[in-house]
UniProtKB/Swiss-Prot annotation:
This is Ribosomal RNA small subunit methyltransferase E. It catalyses: uridine(1498) in 16S rRNA + S-adenosyl-L-methionine = N(3)-methyluridine(1498) in 16S rRNA + S-adenosyl-L-homocysteine + H(+). It is found in: Cytoplasm. The gene is rsmE. Its main location: cytoplasm. It is an enzyme of class 2 (transferase). It comes from Rickettsia conorii (strain ATCC VR-613 / Malish 7).
Length: 244
């Protein structure tokens, strides 16, 4: 039997009792899932892993469960970061949802010259990634950082950074640098609708740890470019291991 999953940001251990008192969790279990006392579900987080739980009691504003068995143990892996320019909210939510399903570990909202917006709703994005984490059977939701300018982000980041460049030669694809992907912490940088400015492209090219990549001959929307690049990196690099 396949049990529903719920992300819990608190300590989990076998045979422990957990109280769920948030409005979201109580509504989800009682109203959406319609679970009853003695029904099972799965609780998880990236620190402790995933556990099979049994509902002991359901109150008006809370419910209690007991963790019966550990189903998955936590583990670590290389970091795969998506630094994506801030685009329209519905498109950004789509990109982040898909990125979470594909195993991204960190999300950086980037402020670039041609961004339509300069801030994001972190609370809403967090809800989006938790839902995608629950759905995709991974343990750890991606970390979402505050919006930052592309200039400041490049200054502080020293891992391998791949930036999608529609002006790049088609043969300079991710496949060409696949040997650099193994066991590396990688950042994928995607610009807004309209791409990067010439100054931003020059800035990106000036760093030794950046590589310009082509995603093919077609011009892709920002959200499509992000998903395409992540999928290619996970397929060709060590990041194609089981999603954490």
């Amino acid at each position: 039997m396949k049990y529903n999953r719920i992300y819990i940001n608190s300590r989990l251990a076998e045979n422990s009792k957990i109280e769920l008192a948030s409005d979201h969790h109580v509504h989800y279990v009682k109203t959406v899932l319609r679970l009853k006392v003695n029904d099972g579900l799965r609780l998880f987080n990236g620190t402790d892993g995933e556990f099979l739980a049994q509902i002991n009691d359901i109150g008006k504003n809370n419910l209690s469960v007991r963790l019966k068995e550990q189903l998955k143990k936590p583990y670590t892996k290389s970091t795969l970061t998506l630094a994506v320019a801030i685009i329209k909210q519905d498109k950004l939510m789509l990109a982040i949802n898909m990125a979470t399903q594909l195993g991204i570990t960190k999300i950086i909202p980037l402020i670039t010259r041609w961004c339509q917006f300069r801030s994001v709703n972190i609370e809403r994005l967090t809800k989006c990634v938790i839902e995608a984490t629950e759905q995709s059977e991974r343990l750890t939701p991606p970390i979402i950082e505050k919006a930052i300018t592309i200039q400041d982000y490049l200054k502080k980041n020293n891992n391998l950074m791949l930036y999608a460049n529609e002006h790049e030669k088609e043969e300079n694809s991710i496949l060409r640098i696949s040997s650099s992907l193994s066991n590396s912490d990688i950042t994928i940088i995607v610009g807004p609708e309209g791409g990067f400015t010439n100054d931003e492209l020059e800035l990106l090219a000036s760093y030794k740890n950046t590589k310009s990549i082509s995603l093919g001959s077609n011009i892709l929307r920002a959200e499509t470019a992000a998903i395409t690049a992540i999928a290619q990196v996970r397929l060709l690099g060590s990041h194609c291991e089981e999603i954490a």
